[in-house]
Amino acid sequence: MSMLCYTLIIAFLIGIWAAPKSEDNVPLGSPATSDLSDTSCAQTHEGLKTSRNTDQRHPAPKKAEDQELGSAANIIVDPKLFQKRRFQSSRVLFSTQPPPLSRGEQSVEFLDNEDTLNRNIRAKRENHPVHNQGEHSVCDSVSDWVIKTTATDIRGNVVTVMEDINLNNEVYKQYFFETKCRNPNPNPVQSECRGIDSRLWNSYCTTTQTFVRALTMEGNQASWRFIRIDTACVCVIIRKTDNF
């Protein structure tokens, strides 16, 4: 009987010694530790995915300067387009810098400085007659280089005029030399021409236009078109019929 009791007690102690240890004392690499590491890695990966999705949904706002530079850089012109240019006008100018206010003694067809299209200057002289002192213009006019964004083409349609172009990684502006009446008056009676006999003629000064070939936008492509610009201030005379 005593031997049986001793045997049962020894078996009970052996069972207690062979019981599994707690998770707090589990060594690295055990199944319990692997489950914990996999769970933490999954949570970290999920956090990274959430952060990336948030950045994609809410991109960082661009600066206004970057947007302006990007819009200017989008209008890229092929240099071959200028080789096909015909009917060049002295009133159309492409330049990286503002042109002089007056053309002076030269009529510039295409302004090229050291950093321009062909690195040369093509100009022609204008022959100005010698004016005597005391001679006056019939109508006073004013001329200046201007930048146009829209204009009327030869078909009467309003077209978009290219203000800036990107050529060989440089930005050029398109200028137009316009001439118009200095003091335009919609009432012909109050804008009589100088030196016209008002007893025989009704006269008034008005601005006239002509067509020049300019670079315009047609859809997403640049193309040459004839557009109207102001080019002169002339005198219009009408014979009075009351005297006849």
Swiss-Prot record:
GO cellular component terms, A-Z: axon; dendrite; extracellular space; synaptic vesicle
Compositional bias ranges of the Basic and acidic residues kind: 47-66
Disulphide-bonded residues: C139-C205, C181-C233, C193-C235
Record-linked InterPro entries: Cystine-knot_cytokine, Nerve_growth_factor-like, Nerve_growth_factor-rel, Nerve_growth_factor_bsu, Nerve_growth_factor_CS, Venom_nerve_growth_factor
Tissue: Expressed by the venom gland.
Role: Nerve growth factor is important for the development and maintenance of the sympathetic and sensory nervous systems. It stimulates division and differentiation of sympathetic and embryonic sensory neurons as well as basal forebrain cholinergic neurons in the brain. Its relevance in the snake venom is not clear. However, it has been shown to inhibit metalloproteinase-dependent proteolysis of platelet glycoprotein Ib alpha, suggesting a metalloproteinase inhibition to prevent metalloprotease autodigestion and/or protection against prey proteases.
Name of the protein described by the UniProt record: Venom nerve growth factor 4
Species name: Tropidechis carinatus
